[in-house]
Every structure is written in C-alpha cells, then in structure tokens.
Amino acid sequence: MRVVTAGIGLRAGHVLTTLKAAMPEVEIVGFYDPQPTFLDMIGPDTPRYASVEAMLAGAAPDLYCVFSPNLFHLDHIRLGLEAGVQVFTEKPVVVSIEETLELARLLANHGGVNRCMVGLVLRYSQHMVDLRAALKAGQLGQIVSLEASEHIAPYHGAFFLRDWRRMTDLSGGFLLEKCCHDIDIYNMITDSRPVRVASFGGRKSFIPGNAPASNAEAEIFHVKKSVWNSVDDAFHSDGDIIDFQTAILQYETGASLAFRTNLNSPDEHRRFCVMGTHGMAEGDFVRGYLRVTARDGTRLADHDYTSGAAVKGAHYGADEMMCADIAKYLRGQSNRLPVSILDAMEAGIAAIAVDQARNTGQMVDLTDTWAKLDSYGLRK
C-alpha cells in the first residue's frame, strides 16, 4: 500500500504512524510540505516533492492523504480525485458552503463519495460504537432533544489563539475546525440534518486584560506547539475566532440541540445528553463514560471507558479504532466506514451556518442549502 501525504504536521504524523501500525504493508513513498516540521514521524528519508501534482504523478500512490491547512483542502482533494487515486482527508473538509458545493460537484463527477475518506474520528470511538448499538436496539425511542458541550483546557485554547487556526479565512472558524466532530455525531444520533440554527458568542478570556502577569503563569499557554503562521501571545492575538459560543440547532426530524463550547475550561469535558421518547443516553468523552437509562429508570447500559483501549492514544482511543477500520476497508475486508465524506460535508455546512447566525445575529435556515447539496445525488 503506497501512501503519500500533502502536509506532515503533528496530526498527519500521528495518523500515518497509527495507520502503519494497523496496516504493516503501508509504505509512505512521498510527501509535499513547504515546512515539514514533523517529518521524523514518517521517516526523514521519505521522498520530498515540490508539488502535489509532481507527487501524485511520480510516486504512483494507492492512497493520497490531505493533511494540509484547511484552506488548501479543496484544491488538494481536487488533485487527488482528478488523478484517480483514493483520497483520505483530515477534517474539516473545506472552509465554506461554496467550497462544499464545489466538492459535491467534484465527487459527483469522479466516482462519488467512496473516492474520499475523512478523519471524523469521534464516529469511531467506543462511546459511539456503544451508543449506536443502543439506538439500533430502540432503547431511546425517537430522539427529542440533545444538549452537549466541548470545553477545552486553557493550554489548548491558547494554542488555537496562537496557531493558524486563529484566522477564520485559514481554518473556517473554531466551530468548524474543532467542533465539526461533535456536530457530526449529533447529526448521526438524530439521523437528520439541522434546518434552522442560531448562535451567540465572542471572545472574553483570551484578551489583553486577562494576560498572565508572570512568565511562570504564562507557561501553560505555550504547552502545545504551533509551527506554521503562528503568533506568540494568545492574549494579544490578531485572530478572529471566538473563545466561547452557544448554538441552538433544530433538525429535520424536529429534534433540537443546545451546544456550547469554551476554550478556557481548566477542568475540561466533552459531554452529551440525548433525550428520547423511551429513554436517554448521557456520556462524556473526556471523563470516560456512557449510561443509557429507560424511561422507567432501568439502567440499560453503564460503560466505563477510564481504562483499557479507550484511554490509549488520541481522541479517547478512536484514532486506533479508525485506522483499524480503514485498514479493513482498504484491504477489501469491509465495504463501508462509520462516517463518509458526505457526513463530514453536512457537519461542516451546519458549523458554518452556526457562525453565520452568530455573526449576523439572525437565525439561519438551511433548507435551500440542503436542496443544492442533495441535487448532486451523493446520498445513495
């Protein structure tokens, strides 16, 4: 399995080494990256190419991975589709609704959604494996409402305010970059898409008035390294992303979601509560549990993920599970993955619309946008 990558940052290095562990026949035969900071993770002797086009033509890959910054994704995915190679792209897929519709056109013209896999890794987590089983068994009944949050620690929030991800034109915004995972799994749980969204938020923590007063106090805000287009000070950042946000989403099924995020949460968590007509599910990725309870109070499931595979590696053990599933898929041992590129595109549209609502102060209706996306016939 000959693999090449556009981008060799920390995420690329981690996923590629995890994939190689799951699939020993993987051979990384080329990379394109003007600033290959984490090249040691895939091997310093990996052939370097001057462009994606040269790499796709010269390396004869079986799999082409897109790990470049978000604003480059559409063009890099386009090159892979046009070259006829299987593509894997890191989330989020693209940075605007217009780019999403252009990608839909490209996929429709180049073999459909199976041509491109996506790294929406939370779908692979044991939490979601077990929750899907509860949903399939009908333990929750019809989904009525959800509440959820992703609250990240100050060291991680500071990374976003220092890194290239601080600029919406480069990343698509914080909600798209970081919380598209979460929006995707709630689309999955409701088995539908948001039709109306509203949002409020801004920046109140990472501002000059809250800057640390000493070098010792400042250390926590530099724990996570940024390597491209970065600034040194999260509190005097030129970034335009939020550090707190609340969103309200209404789904095609009539279910609703209240979602919150905060980038300055010392005791971080990533939790969810799903209320159905016949039961409920409550869990937390960070704190490692999932409980399913019937409407008569009977505890139907009580999963503890604080030991074993779920606490190993990144994303609560889901990276290893994702790479194991991708290995089976590429070997022809399975015919589908838990998440598709179209799922990622739909989550991305929802995240972008939420930010549109926050910026305009108005509710955003997605009916016309879904009609445009559906016109490409990708959902089969």
Each language-model region and where it sits:
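Predominantly a Rossmann-like dinucleotide-binding segment in NAD(P)-dependent oxidoreductases
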Residues: 113-114, 122-235, 361
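Short acidic-hydrophobic, aromatic-tinged amphipathic segments that line or gate anion-handling sites
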Residues: 47-51
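C-terminal helix-rich "cap/oligomerization" subdomain common to oxidoreductases
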Residues: 63-65, 108, 113, 252, ...
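N-terminal Rossmann-like dinucleotide-binding module
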Residues: 1-43
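Glycine-rich phosphate/pyrophosphate-binding beta-alpha loops
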Residues: 180, 260-269
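Beta-strand-loop-alpha-helix segment that lines the small-molecule cofactor/substrate pocket
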Residues: 58, 63, 69-70, 74-123, ...
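Receiver (REC) domain switch-region micro-motif
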Residues: 31, 64, 146
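C-terminal glycine/acidic-rich active-site capping loop/insertion
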Residues: 203-253, 270-343, 376-380
